[in-house]
């Protein structure tokens, strides 16, 4: 947990040292961080470090942490807690979360940076999906197609004929 305290402390110190210039510009200079990793022989952990320096950890009931526009992609990420998928399906769910957020908020969009950590590997695989990626275009098309198809499978609303 000491590692999670460090970026919070440094962030507060930086904001304090630039308080005057931040006030002039109208910015607050605060930052929120997601910090994750594993010490060899211990379980991996993920922390959400707030601008004030305090933090929360992921848990079995909440295995994901979000920064930024947290309200838009939450449904998709909660699927991970219900389904407990393998890594491949989990990544698709994460991309679904990012795509739904881009649809709901104009200030969010690609590139999407994805970091994958496999337990005990002590290495992150980092990937970037650019806005002009053929893969991104394909999954956007497929998500819309399948979501629209799922609507056809839902029962009619009882009062829809009124």
Give the label of every model feature segment.
Residues 1-162:
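N-terminal nucleophile
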